[in-house]
A protein has these predicted regions:
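Conserved switch/coupling elements of ABC/ABC-like ATPase nucleotide-binding domains
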Residues: 217-223
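ABC family nucleotide-binding domain
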Residues: 4-208, 212-215
Length: 223
């Protein structure tokens, strides 16, 4: 399928007072188009930091990130905003839905921000496949945690991003809903050829991925 994402020698250090933490140390790997990759590691191993850098939400101290061959770690301002709108989807652990919008309006929002045409048939299929058709007109406080995370997944998939990043997407869910969400991401990768990079501490969830990258002792992760 060809390479879609590449990290080269990514390093990141944080400092809090006199304490210096090396979150990432020369981290390098690549992801193929349509691949579902799970990044696993203990708490504090740097996996969420890595995800934020890959998604352009944070910058590395050293190293480069490429998406579809474009070096993104140096993008700024309007170019960075445009890149995120066109290329990146992100699923958060806490859903991050807007409480004043219905499920359908939440899914529409990134399309409107990016000035993308709304494919109503595609959205209806997404809602049906994710099992949230009945939630279409509900507000977030009227939905369960599992339903809210499915809406968040629909929102991320609606723009057809080059890469979909998921940061502990099952962290706030019970075991049944967690497995359901992991299975949904796996199907999205297989059915739509969606490239997905998921961070998780749960090895059982990671088993749904095509490939698992392990981060050990806040050091390096290599392909």
């Amino acid at each position: 399928m060809g390479e879609i994402l590449r990290a080269e020698n990514i390093s990141k250090t944080y400092q809090a007072g006199r304490v210096v933490v090396k979150a990432l140390n020369r981290c390098s790997f690549s992801v193929e188009r349509g691949e579902f990759v799970a990044v696993v590691g203990r708490s504090g191993s740097g996996k969420s930091t890595l995800l934020r850098i890959l998604a352009s939400f944070d910058k590395p101290d050293e190293g480069k990130v490429y998406v579809e061959g474009e070096e993104i770690s140096g993008l700024k301002g309007k170019k960075l905003a445009q890149f995120r709108q066109e290329k990146i989807g992100f699923i958060y652990q806490d859903y991050s839905l807007f409480p004043e919008y219905t499920a359908y309006e939440n899914v529409l929002l990134p399309l409107k921000i990016a000035h993308q045409a709304v494919d109503k048939e595609q959205l209806e299929r997404l809602f049906e496949e994710l099992g949230i058709t009945d939630c279409r007109e509900r507000y977030p406080d009227e939905m369960s945690g599992g339903q809210k995370q499915r809406v968040a997944i629909a929102r991320a998939l609606a723009t057809r991003p080059a890469v979909l990043f998921a940061d502990e997407p099952t962290g706030n869910l019970d075991a049944e809903n967690a497995e359901s969400v992991a299975a949904i991401l796996s199907r999205a990768s297989m059915r739509y050829g969606q490239t997905i990079v998921m961070v998780t501490h749960d090895r059982q969830m990671a088993d749904y991925a095509d490939r698992i990258l392990s981060m050990e002792n806040i050091v390096a992760c290599m392909k």
